Amino acid sequence: MSGLCQDRVVVVTGAGRGIGRAHALAFAAEGAPVVVNDVDGDAAAGVVTEVEDLGGKAVADTSDVADWTGARELIGTALENFGRLDVLVNNAGFLRDRMLVNLGEDEWDAVVRVHLKGHFAPLRHAAEHWRAEAKAGRVPQARVINTSSGAGLLGSVGQGNYSAAKAGIAGLTVVAAAELARYGVTVNAIAPAARTRMTEAVFASMARPDSGFDAMAPENVSPLVVWLGSAESGHVTGRVFEVEGGKVALAQGWRHGPAVYKGERWNPAELGAVVRDLLERAPEPEPVYGAN
């Protein structure tokens, strides 16, 4: 019996551990050959072995996804080993948490680089390949699944760098969805909540329970990602899904709210009353994670 992603070639970044590893194994279980990308070569090789033990196909790749050449080589790994590319799952990332007044430039740059540029660079090179395929008359059924976060959608105290990068990923997702649809590419994002090396040292609530359903297991996130990577999901693009445990939710995102139109330029002295009116008519924003 064929799997949901049978023979669909998948690249997963940051796949040596945690959520990325779970994605790689879940795709392999559904028949997909997988490129397991991680800068930790031993971790990537270990996941390849796990995939092969399941009877699947996988190769390891240690490219730095935030490096322009490395990202191009990553896409090349899929094409050279499996002859095609169907799905890109951008997952790689890490944390450098600080309150804003303590956040250093290097900590800002490192997090924005690996998350935001580390999404853009592989996406850019994959998109170039898919555009060429479409122009040659071989329109793909290609899928991109990016990884945003609740921190990117609502903000998270102590994570200004991470929140900004993840918000940027959500913005990149909707733009890429609009631009790449003509080439047969859908682009969506997930905002997962799961236990990883990044989170378990910080959030005690994510610890594995002694019994019962492990709501924070990273494997809970992967079924949605696999479905989004399948041919079945072609009607879904430009969306951000929150996924945690057994819950899947659609994030609503920014929307136009109450407005006042004057028909001419405002005087600054008038705007206090205008803003008060707008705030009274608007719903309260959802709280920033960690805010008192």
Predicted regions and their residues:
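The beta1-alpha1 cofactor-binding region of Rossmann-like NAD(H)/NADP(H)-dependent oxidoreductases
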Residues: 41-42, 62-75, 105
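C-terminal helical subdomain
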Residues: 189, 210-292
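Residue(s) in the substrate-gating loop at a strand-loop-helix junction
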Residues: 149
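A glycine-rich helix->loop->beta "capping" turn
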Residues: 5-6, 54-57, 77-88, 96, ...
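Active-site helix of classical SDR
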Residues: 123, 165, 173
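Canonical Rossmann dinucleotide-binding motif of NAD(H)/NADP(H)-dependent dehydrogenases/reductases
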Residues: 2-35
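Substrate-binding pocket helix/loop in short-chain dehydrogenase/reductase
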Residues: 99-100, 104-112
